[in-house]
């Protein structure tokens, strides 16, 4: 008797399993939306309750792309309470990531057909060429709106500035394009990306236009500008924000000193420099700097000694501010970390067709980071500035 052989269509089974998973995900997410609505209104659908906080007013549909495929969400409409669901918030973040990824592929020179294939592999559905063009246009518009938004953080006591150099191809020739970036700590102690602009090169006119642009959007109340040594930036800041003071990034200052000494002596000199900024007040730091400069002269490191004598004062400005803030305002580390993230992203693109494309991708990344825990977590307590002002007044 011959055995019965059952032939299975693997593709059909895969499709059925995928649809089963997709349906299960859709059902689960809609169940979660209903549960969130019940929790907000403190009552189930059609339930009469004295504790009810709001009323249902039907649903609206919203498509959500998941790893299981596209699902349709039935989002409850509520009256009397605001329905902010974590599911929709995750959708918004995902949508932002998709926009950024599409823009990166576009700027990297990936063909529209290739982008269609990639989106189908990643998100389970093919994005048409017209959709890709529309998304890029939409992304650029969103970024420009975000980039030129009014600054509503009140006063911004601490501002950090830097310039990022990227490559662009202009008529077959490669040249640098500078993107000027500024972030700040607002009066409530939260970090905020103030903005980014194309500077062509870090000259005085570029910095002045950049600072004026920030001021016109609402930047005010600056007490300290932190950045690397750039005379053009300092002159521009002094003209636009004459009430501000300057703190030279201590880390960049150390590197500048290290550039004048043999590598074998860097470790020892680093400890000497750190000892200056470990002092409890500016007077003690100045005395320590004098001693370090003298020791460097004895070590035959005259150029390093001269740099300390000439520039140490601009690295000590932070000591005029609350000690609780010293560690976070004496360096540009807060913006350097952002710059590393930007460079990691822009490295994928390599060379940009123009400065505007470079600016858009930098801003896309800055906007993304600003919307994460980076911008939502308190960075420092500003009560110490208020206490210092009360004591001085």
Question: What are these model-derived regions, one by one?
Answer:
Residues 33, 68, 80, 102, ...:
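Mobile genetic element proteins and their domesticated derivatives, centered on retroelements
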Residues 84, 257-291:
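Metal-dependent DNA phosphodiester-chemistry modules and their immediately adjacent helices/loops
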Residues 2-4, 35, 42, 107, ...:
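Acidic/histidine-rich catalytic cores and adjacent linkers
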Residues 224-231, 236-272:
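Conserved beta-strand -> loop -> alpha-helix junction used to position metal-binding or nucleic-acid-contacting
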Residues 74-79, 87-92, 125-226, 231, ...:
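RNase H-like nuclease fold core
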Residues 1-89, 167:
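Short, conserved DNA-binding cores of transcription-related domains
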Residues 113-124:
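DNA-recognition alpha helix
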Residues 97-109:
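Short, amphipathic alpha-helical "recognition" segments used to contact nucleic acids or chromatin
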């Amino acid at each position: 008797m011959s055995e019965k052989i059952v032939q299975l269509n693997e593709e059909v089974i895969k499709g059925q399993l995928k649809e089963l998973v997709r349906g299960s995900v859709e059902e689960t997410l809609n169940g979660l939306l209903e549960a969130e609505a019940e929790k907000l209104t403190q009552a189930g659908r059609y339930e009469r309750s004295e504790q009810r906080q709001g009323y249902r007013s039907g649903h609206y549909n919203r498509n959500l792309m998941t790893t299981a495929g596209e699902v349709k969400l039935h989002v409850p409409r509520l009256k009397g309470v605001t329905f902010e669901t974590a599911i929709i918030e995750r959708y918004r973040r995902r949508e932002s990531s998709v926009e950024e990824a599409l823009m990166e592929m576009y700027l990297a020179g990936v063909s529209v057909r290739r982008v269609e294939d990639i989106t189908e592999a990643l998100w389970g559905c093919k994005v048409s060429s017209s959709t890709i063009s529309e998304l890029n246009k939409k992304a650029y518009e969103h970024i420009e709106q975000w980039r030129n938004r009014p600054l509503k953080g009140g006063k911004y006591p601490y501002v950090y500035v830097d310039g990022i150099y990227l490559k662009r191809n202009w008529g077959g020739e490669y040249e640098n394009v500078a993107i000027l970036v500024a972030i700040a700590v607002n009066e409530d102690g939260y970090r905020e990306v103030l903005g980014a602009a194309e500077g062509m090169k870090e000259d005085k006119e570029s910095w002045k236009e950049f600072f004026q642009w920030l001021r016109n959007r609402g930047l005010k109340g600056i007490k300290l500008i932190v950045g690397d040594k750039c005379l053009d930036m300092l002159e521009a800041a002094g003209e636009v924000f004459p009430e501000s003071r300057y703190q030279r990034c201590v880390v960049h200052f150390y590197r500048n000193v290290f550039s004048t000494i043999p590598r074998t002596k860097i470790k020892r000199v680093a400890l000497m420099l750190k000892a200056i900024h470990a002092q409890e007040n500016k007077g003690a730091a100045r005395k320590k700097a004098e001693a370090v400069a003298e020791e460097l002269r004895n070590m035959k490191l005259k150029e390093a000694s001269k740099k300390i004598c000439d520039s140490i004062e601009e690295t000590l400005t932070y000591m005029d501010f609350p000690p609780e803030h010293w560690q976070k305002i004496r360096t540009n580390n807060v913006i350097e970390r952002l710059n590393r993230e930007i460079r990691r992203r822009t490295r994928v693109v390599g060379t940009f067709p123009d400065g505007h494309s470079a600016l858009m991708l930098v801003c896309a990344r800055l906007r993304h980071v600003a919307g994460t825990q980076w911008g939502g977590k308190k960075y420092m307590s500003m009560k110490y500035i208020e206490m210092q002002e009360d004591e001085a007044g």
